[in-house]
Amino acid sequence: MDNFKIYSTVITTAFLQVPHLYTTNRLWKPIEAPFLVEFLQKRISSKELKNTKAICHIDPSWVNLNASFIRDDMISIKATTDDMDLDAICRISLPLPMNTNDLTAELEKMKRILLDLSEKFNLELIITKEPAYFTPEQTGESKELCIYVHALGFRSNLMECEPQLLAFVDLIKKNGMTLPPQHYIIEPMELNSYSVLPLYMGVDMENFKHISRAFKTSIYAPSLITLSRDLKANPQIFFSGAVHSLSLLARKTLRESISVNSKSFFYRRLTNITPGKLLFIRKYYQQKVNQLILKYQSLIRVTNEYIEFQSISTNLLEMVIKNFTIQVLHEIVEVQISLNENCAMSPELIIDSFFGHTGNQIVVITPKEDSFNQLIVVGNQSSTDEASDTSILHYLSDFIMGSNQVINPNLRQIKAIFEIHPDFEDFISGKKNGKLTRIMELSACLIQLEMEEEDDNLYLNLVSDSFPDFKESFKNVINEFPAEESFFIPEVCHRPIIGTGGSLIQATMRKHNVFIQFSNSFNLPQNKISMIRYDNVIIRCPRKNKANICLAKNDLKQIVQEYDSLQSKTLIRFSSGQYRHILHVNGQKNIIGQIEKNENVYIMIPLKEPLDGTSQLSIQGNDENASRAANELVNSAFGYEYEFKIDQEIDPNKEYEFYNLIVVPFLQIMNIIVTFEKDLITFTFEKDTNENTLTKAIELLSNYLETQKTKIIFKKIIKKFVLGSASSKSNTSNSNTNGNFRSMNNAKSRTTIDNTSQSGASPQRHKMPVITTVGGAQAIKGYIPNTYYNGYGYGYGYTYEYDYNYANSNKAQTNNRHKYQNGRK
């Protein structure tokens, strides 16, 4: 792109220095930028301006600058730039409650760490007595003294510093400004690379949530935005908790449960994406990219040159690439504008026309010349903002049909380039290219579908020499783009939904003019600390009919509910210790998926641990299969349990002793999960645990309880967990696609232990997961050949498709690269 300029909007902030209790004084500078000086002179005197310091960055190459006060201490600056660097000045502001009357002494204790963070990340750390740079939430009247910690600097530096700063502030909050910490501690865990961060986070952050609940530990990790940056330092995850042994165990559990060193990683890059489109994705699609990263536990890294994907399985890799293409690349379009040779455009005209409103979501590419008659505009197919029109057609209309009356009379050609996943070739074009032919018959345009040997995706080109015809054809084309929604329905319900010979599903598809695809997810990867239910149903239709997707989905849910009411359910005794045991076994062997597949049942294991004491786990299927599956699950994934009833509850002020002397050592040394709640202590252990080990564990527990003047009044060992069948009618309410369980106790018979008043922790259950040491096998890296995706995940095993308007609407794309044209001669 040496011969081109790429224009886009840059938004940054100028922070003015305010009265403060402390500042590291690293980035404050006198205001020298001419634009900012001129702007501030309208509000403050020259003398005040001379004595005012600020943190800001205004590049001399920026043009079309605009500024406005966000607050008295903050100025928003918007400009047009031809620099692809997205870094801007930002802030992190954190309230910090104080529990001391000697504020000066406590600030002195904080200075060393703040100075270290400032130097390490090149940031300004400032403490103010009053809220600055943000408006705090109103939480009612509070007499608690509060100060405010602010980090100011470039966004990239803030993202690296953020987990350490959050952990530090959390530590101070919980320790009442007592440094060094007396109760709460921080344990770091260094990762080999930012690329493995999604794997540790888990689907929708469930791994972190699970670890946090289990170990009463707060977890702070780097932002996912860092995945698109070339950061030199290895990332760190921080664990903060009141019990040191639990924080150490939380770190060990997360590291060993994911076991990165024993996994193979698979990579793929999309390299044929233009720099303008890559910049647009980085500026306006980061949130969507983050959602895909968390949903598929896969790296998506968008750079100036390519998009890189990394995953732990080829299946997940292809799924994330396809969904990225649908949800991101499908939504972005490039439009090439060519004028007559005697009509030239200037950079000033382009900036004034496209960036006159500095909030425009658009990228413009022009030759690096003083005048030119061609340019490329990158934007969204349709508006992404309900309050204002952010579609590319809106910007093009203002430019071409605007008041200057220069562009439209001299328009030679306008061409839109859409990037489409190869699987949707027939979906877009229709039977015998009928859809595209109809669009061309309605307005004067040419439509081409192209795919070269080196291309990752299919390209649809829409060409016209008239903007009104182009606009009409553009709308008709995007109306034929696929709209879809994916979700999970238990595989046991698929065949009843489909019906004999596909009769039910065809009726649903015909009724709503959509088509529905089913897949199984039995063999997709699981981990040892969370249960993942992957989407296995897709409803798809042309975008013009997307409202029908919700209607079809509701019909499917109704069929599922009716089927559930006819199914029997086998109940299994279920506890939090067994929940952790099952997750550990399932992460190694995928037991749940295999049983569901072999027995045609649905194991309604919850996605979160049960919190209401001993519960009931349901298995749904026919009488024989559900019962057989229940026994198989208990035999292959359950451990035995020992329950101990004690004569008084464990003293909340002595919980840390119980963790340090019983819970953690028993798990680490004897592989016994110890959970306790109110007056009940439970051991969960492997079935082949040595009898001597159990005897020793019971002896140690008894000895500890004696020191607390507590004794065991009842104990029993539990080896049978299958409770038998439940009537379908009474259990219909438990049929939930996210898993379900029923408490075996009254709601008030088990309570959470809230030790907030003792150590500042939020109310938590006290349960421990199974931990098994994982070997340090070297990672084996596999590479995906540079071929495009060919229909994985939507119907392998069985597929039923029906299109009311056109046959074979989603025929699988073959691997034969081709190029063809369908247009007017």
From Swiss-Prot:
**Signal peptide feature range:** none
The reply to whether Ligase figures as a keyword in the UniProt entry is no
The KH domain covers 482-556
Species for this entry: Saccharomyces cerevisiae (strain ATCC 204508 / S288c) (Baker's yeast)
Which residue intervals are annotated with compositional bias (Polar residues) in the record? 741-762
One GO cellular component, as annotated: cytoplasm
Composition-biased stretches, type Low complexity, lie in 727-740
Q: Which molecular-function annotation in GO is an example for this chain?
A: mRNA binding
Q: Which UniProt keywords apply?
A: Cytoplasm, Phosphoprotein, RNA-binding
Q: Where is this region: Disordered?
A: 727-766
What the entry lists under CDD domains is as follows: KH-I_MUG60_like
Subcellular location per the Swiss-Prot or TrEMBL entry: Cytoplasm
As a miscellaneous remark, the entry gives: Present with 922 molecules/cell in log phase SD medium.
Q: Which InterPro entries match?
A: KH_dom, KH_dom_type_1_sf
Any idea what this protein is called? Answer: KH domain-containing protein YLL032C
Q: Which residues carry this modification: Phosphoserine?
A: 762
